[in-house]
Amino acid sequence: EYSYDGQWIYFNSHRTGRMHVYRMKPDGTKQEQLTFDAFDNWFPHPSPDNRTVAFISYLEDQKGQHPFGREVKLRLLDTQTKKITDLTPVFYGGQGSFNVHSWSPDGKKLAFVKYTRFN
């Protein structure tokens, strides 16, 4: 997904053996890994001010997949410090929870889908 200022494209890649968040310039240069933790991180969406990137993290190893019906959490990455903050506690979600652009125009809210468990 493009940053609002058009300077970066944010994406996820499994190139290290675990899914992580990256960014690169629109011409493909300056590729930079942004997450380095033990989670599989998916669906990065930069904020309107380009200061943070929201994404979901799977708590169990999904081996490059992003299924629905798993334990995930919504997290924020500070693009300057690279610090990651948990925005939500663990919830039941995954594929379909946070796939599309989800920031409000003023950057103060995020929309996401939380599933109900049926046993």
Where are these regions (language model features)?
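Sequence signature of WD/YWTD-type beta-propeller architectures
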Residues: 1-119
